[in-house]
Every structure is written in structure tokens, then in C-alpha cells.
Amino acid sequence: MSSRGRAIQKALANYPDFNQTLSALNEMEEQTEKSFSTFTTLSASNGSSPEYFLGSMLKESDESESVDDDESVNDDLSPENAVEPYKGSEGEDSFGDKDETVFFEEDLPWSAMVQKTVNGKLVAELSAPQGLTPKQLSQWTDSVLALMDLSKNIRLSSAKIDYLASGLKITEHMSSCFSSTAPPLLKEFQPVTLSHRDTSPERGPSSRPSRPTVMPPARTLILENTPSTPTPESTSSASGSPLNLPEIKPPKDWASIAIREFSLNPLSGDGPQYKGTLARLFGSLESALQYANGGNPSTKDMLIAGLRRKGIFNKIRIKYFLDPIYD
């Protein structure tokens, strides 16, 4: 019995079934020694290293594989396998970004005015000319405001526009019957020159327009009031008046005119006529009579007001003459 067995026997002398347990341990130890000696003999005869020597073998294989990888990389970087750069390509530092052409989306085409109807009301959006300086934009705004003030006394809808080198010339042809809202100056037929600095000239039976303020050459706006050719009836009636005033006609029967059908001739001459009634344009007979009783408008004024109320004025004026014809 080995020294270890004797030491265990001494320490466990009082252990129950000690002798039986000790004999079992001795048998297991003898079997382990026999199997180990057999494995060592077979390994020596086959010439292979035991498993505890595989660590050094794996280390050597890793080193050989890394050497092979380095050689393959060097082969890929050889001049024969090098990839030729794209012709005309440059490095990042020499990239000519200033020479690149940049395309921007085109702006929408400019339009002088856009009309639309919002909640039954006509809304016009005016577009200022492009490329104006702040001073020029202010002058353009003043010109529009002056024109709006002038429209209170002059019917611009029936005026004639002439293009001049210095601006626009607007000429209104007066009818033989003056409206109750027309200023006294209109009957004297005195030319009036307005600018954006002179928006409200004095008007009276004996007044004369003051010296006009000259606008810049490209912004001058000339407006003249010229009478239409008087008819013999108006001439005879005016001559009988001590003040040379035209004859005042009795008010029209708008109740019957508003329900009568009128027609508008097309500008092209070969298209169909536009037909309708003033009551239909205003939405009802009561609305048409309410507008007519607010002043002394002409039939053409009633037509234009009705077209604007319906929201089709811009569409009709480019296709038809705005002179209503009643059968």
C-alpha cells in the first residue's frame, strides 16, 4: 500500500466500511495507471504528439497563414495588378467645385394682375414689375393709388389707353348724359395731367388745373377728358340752357330693363353671342334695382357691375364687346 493509502487509512480508521472503500479506491488507481501506460505506448508508436502539444502546433499554423496573406496582398499591389485611374479624375484637394454648373428652377411667368372671387367679392392681386429698386417700387405703388383715386371721378372702364414713350395715356370719351356723380370739371373738358404726387386736384366750375408735377420719364401717366361728338339733340338742348348744360334725361325703368334679355357680340366676329339678363348677373331683380337706385348708371355700367358681381368680368371682356344689345 502506498504512503498516501496508509495516511488515508490512519485518518479514516473509524469510518464505517473503511476496508471495503479502501480496496475499491486501490482498484480504481490500478486501472487508471494501466490505461495511461497504454495510451503513452500507442502515441509513441504512431509518432503523433499528445493533445497537450497542440497549442504550439496551432501557433505555427497561424504564423504560416499570416505570411501567406501578406504575400497575396503584395501580389495584388504589384504594378501588373494595379487599377488604372479614370481619365480626367482629380484628387479631392484639386476638385473644381466652382466650375460646376448649378441649375435652378425657373420662376413662374410674371402676370400683371390675378383676379379671383372670395366669398362673393372680387379680389385683384397686382404684381409689381420685376427688378425694381425700393424707390421704383414706391413710385409704382403711388401710381396705382393715384389711379384708384382718379377712378372715383372718371370711368376708367370705358377709357382708351395709348402707349407713349414716357408712360400711358388714358382718354375717356364722355357720353351726352352726365352721371349724378360726375364732377363739375368734366363739363368744361379741361385736360388733366396727374402724377403720383398730385392725386387729388381741385375741381370746380371755374377752377383750372394747377401746374402738373412731372414724374420720372418712365413713370409719367397722362389722363385726358375729351368729349365725344355731340348729337344734334344734345347740341340743341344745351344751346337753350343759359349754362350750356346738357339735357337731363328722366330715370330709366330698371325694373323692366333688368329682366329683358340682352346679347353681346363676340370680338372675333364669328363666335356665338353671349346672352343674359341683368337680374341674372346680380343674382336677383332686387339686387339689380338696389344697385341702379344708388346712382344714375348707364346700361353698360350696370352690365359691368353685374359681370363683376357674378365673377366673370375678366372672362367676358376678352371675348365680347361690352355693349349690351336689346331686341
From Swiss-Prot:
Alphabetized UniProt keyword annotations: Chaperone, Host cytoplasm, Phosphoprotein, Viral RNA replication, Virion
Biased composition, class Acidic residues, residue ranges: 62-78
Major subcellular site: virion
Biased composition (Polar residues): 34-49
Modified residues (Phosphotyrosine): Y15
Record's GO cellular component terms: host cell cytoplasm; virion component
Record field: compositional bias (Basic and acidic residues): 87-96
SUBUNIT field: Homodimer. Interacts with the L polymerase; the association of P and L forms the polymerase complex and positions P optimally for encapsidation of newly synthesized genomes with the nucleoprotein. Interacts (via N-terminus) with N(0). Interacts (via C-terminus) with N in ribonucleocapsid (via C-terminus); this interaction allows to package the L polymerase in the virion and positions the polymerase on the template, since P acts as a bridge between N and L.
Comment block on domains: The N-terminus is disordered and is involved in binding N(0). The region of interaction with the L polymerase is necessary for transcription. The hinge region is highly variable. The central domain is involved in oligomerization. The C-terminus is basic and essential for binding the N-RNA template.
Protein name: Phosphoprotein
